[in-house]
Amino acid sequence: LAWGDTHFANGLAEALRRLGQEVVIDAFAARNRATSAIDDVSLVLRGPRRIDPPAHGRSLLWIISHPDEITSDELSKYDRIFAASIPWAARAGARLGHSITPLLQCTDAVLFRPQGIPRGKDIVFVGTARGIARPSVVAPIEAGVDVTVYGPDWRRFIPGRFIRASGISHSDLPARYESAAVVLNDHWPAMQKEGFISNRAYDVVAAGGRVISDTVEGLQEHFGGAVRTYDSTSELIGMLRGDLDDLFPSYEKLDAVSRRVRMEDSFDARAQVLLDAAIGTLAR
């Protein structure tokens, strides 16, 4: 599990435990754990690397990123398959010959919720540089827009004065998101192309924050105005130079969207879907 995937797994595990399930999390290195035979159901969170399920018990696959790497052979190993994209689930299901159920990403509604912190003026980005000059961060800075960056590997791409820290505690993210004027977000090219909405958008909106992101199919509609999208860096820069309050709905509408996300797009909601699927496979 990578950094973000670890928090995702922990949040989902806690939600399943609240539903009365006994849950163990295996990192990638433990994917062939010798005691896996005692598990009734294995759930694989498919990120950058393929993981074949244990030979024993039932297995569920939830594809949350890197859809361009999925093969029919990989899917054939699982009893049920979910994917965090509505359009990709339909297209890939037809192309690869497997039934794929849409199950969008989500947020930890226990952690990510408004705390009543006043909105400040910081334009915030949280994440690694990925070894590239990510346009969503570099282009605004080069255009004279101040961006407060949290994350590693940025020093060769932007001046150090824009880097607030090389990381931020997961527990500190809700307050940082809520207090930001706006949080910038972007996607891996394959995720953007295939309609995989990153879970950062869910986290920020659940915490009461506002997001500007690159365009992904269904993103702006799903978040009811709490997320605004751009199609080019010039459009992004124009948005950031303008009055950000004019881009987003009123506080009351944003609060309603935040409550809906915490209710409908929580780990608890997703855990219930996965538990129902697991019970269904065990009943076969």
Where are these regions (language model features)?
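N-terminal pre-catalytic "stem/leader" segment of glycosyltransferase-like enzymes
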Residues: 1-56, 80, 88-95, 101-102, ...
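Catalytic binding pocket for nucleotide-activated donors in carbohydrate/polymer assembly enzymes
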Residues: 7-11, 16, 24-27, 159-282
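Catalytic core of nucleotide-activated saccharide and alditol-phosphate transferases
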Residues: 9, 52-145, 154-155, 265-269, ...
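Hydrophobic beta-strand scaffold residues
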Residues: 23, 59, 100, 147, ...
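Structural alpha-helical scaffold elements that stabilize or flank donor/cofactor-binding regions
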Residues: 35, 74-75, 175-176
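Short glycine-rich anion-binding loops that position phosphate/pyrophosphate groups of nucleotides
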Residues: 47-49, 65, 189
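Catalytic core and acceptor-binding pocket of nucleotide-sugar-dependent glycosyltransferases
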Residues: 147-158, 163
